């Protein structure tokens, strides 16, 4: 939490923190809530009904300034206006995405995330994503939200009607271009459609005969 608080203080300077939007309550992201509340007791916490249920179960205080949002609600913060898209089970029940309509940045929580360190890089156009991160991204999807394809489809449909310029997930690079490439991957994965047409031949061979048969089958399939 120390690095997070240092970053917040660096950005704010002597100003107070007015709002804290909670997109996801998993402790790798939300463990610092109590410290934020202690340092900024007047902060208004924004979340959905499930967010506050989990906050209570995790032992965090819910102050009277808390703001509960529902799917599609918008809040204006002056220069910035946020719209909230609830995304239950992508991949926790309280998960939601927050769209800054002023900048077009979608803060997508765990959706569109990727395994792997970025090694000082931040944006998708700073890496060779297909070579370096597509496999970890596919593995991330499979492990984190792969079971919940219909829920991912719901989020994609909600986001489709908005002018999204950037996607900022909680893991992996921030997407500031070529968004359709990764959205198409998520669409295919969540529909359980293959990215490429092919046949997987799985076999076990104690004496090598089944292996020969499998190789012969593979050759015939390529013809």
Predicted region positions:
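Pre-active-site segment of Zn-dependent metallo-hydrolases
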Residues: 1-20, 43
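Active-site neighborhood of phospho(di)ester-bond hydrolases with catalytic His/Asp-centered motifs
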Residues: 17-25, 45-48, 106-109, 167-171
């Amino acid at each position: 939490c120390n690095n997070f608080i240092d970053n917040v203080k660096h950005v704010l300077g002597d100003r107070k923190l007015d709002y804290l939007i909670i997109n996801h309550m998993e402790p790798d992201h939300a463990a610092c809530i109590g410290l934020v509340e202690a340092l900024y007791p007047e902060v208004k916490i924004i979340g959905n009904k499930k967010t506050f249920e989990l906050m209570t179960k995790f032992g965090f205080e819910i102050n009277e300034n808390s703001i509960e949002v529902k799917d599609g609600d918008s809040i204006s913060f002056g220069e910035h206006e946020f719209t909230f898209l609830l995304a239950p089970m992508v991949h926790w029940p309280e998960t939601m995405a927050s769209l800054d309509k002023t900048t077009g940045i979608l803060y997508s929580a765990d959706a569109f995330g990727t395994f792997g360190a970025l090694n000082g890089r931040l944006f998708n156009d700073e890496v060779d994503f297909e070579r370096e991160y597509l496999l970890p991204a596919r593995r991330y999807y499979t492990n984190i939200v792969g079971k919940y394809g219909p829920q991912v489809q719901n989020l994609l449909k909600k986001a489709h009607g908005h002018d999204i310029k950037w996607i900022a997930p909680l893991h992996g690079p921030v997407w500031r271009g070529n968004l359709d490439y990764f959205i198409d991957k998520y669409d295919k994965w969540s529909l359980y459609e293959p990215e490429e047409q092919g046949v997987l031949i799985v076999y076990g061979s104690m004496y090598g005969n089944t292996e020969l048969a499998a190789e012969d089958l593979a050759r015939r399939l390529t013809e």
